[in-house]
Amino acid sequence: NEKTSSLLQVLVSIQAQILIETPYCNEPGHEFQNGTPAGDKYNKEYNDHTRFFVMKSTMLDLLENPDSYPQFTEVIKTHFKLKKDYVINICEKWISESTKYADQMKKMLDKMKPLLNKL
């Protein structure tokens, strides 16, 4: 409720519902699949799809176009400079776990590495 919820409550809700290993099972109508073989399969596919678009839209795009959001250019550059090794490691992990997007994700990471190293 926007009239009674604090920012902290919203952030805790996001953390509890989205930033978990199995966000698919938090989608309405899918809760009953949590912990089942079908739920595990759908979670893996959901995570694979989400990770692909995270790499594409929130990593590669921002590295290629850091001035897309002029008010955040320095924040974006500083974030990637400080987290460069972590970003590369997590992307490599995601690629190794991907069943559908591994080749595309590998190409994106190959584009990201020189951009990260320039920071």
Give residue ranges: language-model regions.
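E2/UBC-UEV (E2-variant) core
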Residues: 1-23
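Charge-rich (especially acidic), low-complexity segments
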Residues: 24-119
